[in-house]
Amino acid sequence: MLQIVGALILLIAGFAILRLLFRALISTASALAGLILLCLFGPALLAGYITERITRLFHIRWLAGVFLTIAGMIISFMWGLDGKHIALEAHTFDSVKFILTTALAGGLLAVPLQIKNIQQNGITPEDISKEINGYYCCFYTAFFLMACSACAPLIALQYDISPSLMWWGGLLYWLAALVTLLWAASQIQALKKLTCAISQTLEEQPVLNSKSWLTSLQNDYSLPDSLTERIWLTLISQRISRGELREFELADGNWLLNNAWYERNMAGFNEQLKENLSFTPDELKTLFRNRLNLSPEANDDFLDRCLDGGDWYPFSEGRRFVSFHHVDELRICASCGLTEVHHAPENHKPDPEWYCSSLCRETETLCQEIYERPYNSFISDATANGLILMKLPETWSTNEKMFASGGQGHGFAAERGNHIVDRVRLKNARILGDNNARNGADRLVSGTEIQTKYCSTAARSVGAAFDGQNGQYRYMGNNGPMQLEVPRDQYAGAVETMRNKIREGKVEER
């Protein structure tokens, strides 16, 4: 039994050693092959690289290529047809093959036309300068490889080396030149086709999933994945900056939507939202269906976070969505944010502050008392204050959530918090929003009127500042549109949303 166990151990150890030896052999062979290739083709590659750098420095890269191609074609015809090569016979493959590669190199000089076609799709030469440099490097390297191929028979004659061996060496150099030229041509063609495909897809497809589309492009074109992604990002960014495309980061990744198509679809949906005062999540989902052709996960996430025609409000019966068209028919507890429908008579002045319960009123009063209490007095009574606050855990928790996240949305807590910050900075600041003047400023800081909107997303924070009926910006001061204050983490999205509104003429200039 012990002998069997010992034999198994030796067998396993032997296999492990053989595996290590095989890996070492493969690594050694790879390194040796790489060294041989470097010795064979490295000088030609280095010469091509140096030539490209020098001609680029003097801005004669294309012109030098033209002269080199003409000279190469003349020499190739002299070798192939007139038999001027000492070691090559005329009208044979060995002498005629150079005509083929030189003609192919001449075709590569059409690169300015290729670049012009690429530019028509939105890519500039600066965007692909690295690829153009590599293209010319391949062009010049191919000529040096052809020169090595032509010199191989001469070396065999001069140094009495086996003609057969040098013939294979010359053929290897010529094949390397041919492959180099074909690879360069395929790369510039793939680049042109890629830019055309991206532009055409953006024109034809109103909705695209970024990740799946990029993966498809990387699989379809023989370009490095990093280059494909860079070209793709460049063209996408251009259209987003021009307002032709919108990007949404949703549950299953980023989605790209044609802006005009999106606006048409959402305009119709926002009109439907005006038909009822509020919608439950299921009612909203049924109404919206999948009008943007998103995946189910992305569609649900869009409804939850990205609708800019209204916002979610916490009613006593649950969370409901209300169009900004009906927002004046609501009243919101200044303490906990609870919302209810309030059909006030026309020209009725709303209450400066409304509380849904005596508990919320007591909480707000207590917070104000603590804020106004002198620091030393607050410290001395900290224990008592703590006991009082402990009596109101549920309401306090709700308030704290609203303070921290912006709550459902009009910035009652944000007005006061930012007001305190401005006062600490020695700015002349006061709160105006408590008088609830229609379309009035919330705060006045050093003579600047500021409207505060703290909703759950940037689109909703900005959307809450626009009229639900005509879509125009509601808050106009004596000096033009009032400044809009949103949460810090929504700033980038709010700027993009406001830029779109301005582009659509929704903000009046004075």
UniProtKB/Swiss-Prot annotation:
Tell me yes or no: is Translocase among this UniProt entry's keywords: no
Residues on the membrane's Periplasmic side span: 23-30, 83-94, 158-164
Q: How does it sit in the membrane?
A: Multi-pass membrane protein
Sorted alphabetically, the keyword list is: Cell inner membrane, Cell membrane, Membrane, Transmembrane, Transmembrane helix
* Tagged with keyword Cell membrane: yes
Q: Which residues cross the membrane?
A: 2-22, 31-51, 62-82, 95-115, 137-157, 165-185
**Residues exposed to the Cytoplasmic side:** 1, 52-61, 116-136, 186-510
**A cellular-component GO term for this protein:** plasma membrane
Location(s), subcellular: Cell inner membrane
Principal location class: membrane
Name it: Inner membrane protein YeeR
Species of provenance:
Escherichia coli (strain K12)
Origin organism lineage:
Bacteria, Pseudomonadati, Pseudomonadota, Gammaproteobacteria, Enterobacterales
